[in-house]
């Protein structure tokens, strides 16, 4: 009896499982929460069944690039190489602070006048975002509670979420002058 290799080749890992597996691996190799530059990695899935249990060897994580500005990193044409992998990973560190909400005249507003880095309740954070054909997921880890993670299975919104989606889904079209002739 022959093994159905086609079926086993189509087993896919969920984005949230990829994110937690990648983050756990990077957490063991990174020093602290103060990386000065955002990093881009490519991930090859070696064993999709081992991703959810964080099995050693389930993923191959390849460093691709880094930049002082996460948005410039994601927008760089050279970052498109990440799409050659099963998933792309963005890792960045920074400050997080609570968003205070106020209700004035039946309208809810947020007080974002104080940057997170200057907020009295600021916390150092490391963010890992994974994007693949099946979606986006992210994992946060705070310096003051390094044994705990906060996960998001794809509901994040905002400029970083848009930039990550654009990296994966919006290939850059480059037309050279020679092709116009």
Regions found by a protein language model. Give the residues of each.
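Hydrophobic side chains in beta-strands
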Residues: 43-44, 92, 131-132
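N-terminal interaction modules that seed assembly of large macromolecular complexes
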Residues: 24-74
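Glycine-rich, aromatic-bearing surface loops/beta-hairpins
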Residues: 103-181
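Eukaryotic short linear interaction motifs
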Residues: 49-52, 99, 137-138
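Short N-terminal edge-element motif at the start of the domain
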Residues: 1-34
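Short HxH-centered metal-ligating active-site micro-motif
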Residues: 68-108
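Compact, glycine/acidic-enriched structural inserts
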Residues: 4, 9, 59-64, 151-163
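Short, surface-exposed beta-edge/turn micro-motifs
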Residues: 36-41, 85-87, 123-127
């Amino acid at each position: 009896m022959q093994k159905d290799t086609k079926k086993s080749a189509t087993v896919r890992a969920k984005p949230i499982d990829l994110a937690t597996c990648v983050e756990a691996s990077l957490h063991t190799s990174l020093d602290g929460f103060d990386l000065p530059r955002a990093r881009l990695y490519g991930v090859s899935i070696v064993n999709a069944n081992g991703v959810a249990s964080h099995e050693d060897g389930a993923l191959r994580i390849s460093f691709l690039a880094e930049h002082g500005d996460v948005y410039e990193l994601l927008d760089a044409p050279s970052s498109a190489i990440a799409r050659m992998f099963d998933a792309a990973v963005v890792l960045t560190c920074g400050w997080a602070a609570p968003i205070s909400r106020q209700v004035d005249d039946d309208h809810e507003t947020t007080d974002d006048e104080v940057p997170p880095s200057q907020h009295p309740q600021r916390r150092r954070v490391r963010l890992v975002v994974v994007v693949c054909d099946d979606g986006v997921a992210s994992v946060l880890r705070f310096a003051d509670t390094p044994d705990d993670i906060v996960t998001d299975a794809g509901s994040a919104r905002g400029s970083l979420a848009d930039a990550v989606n654009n990296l994966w889904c919006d290939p850059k079209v480059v037309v050279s002058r020679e092709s116009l002739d």
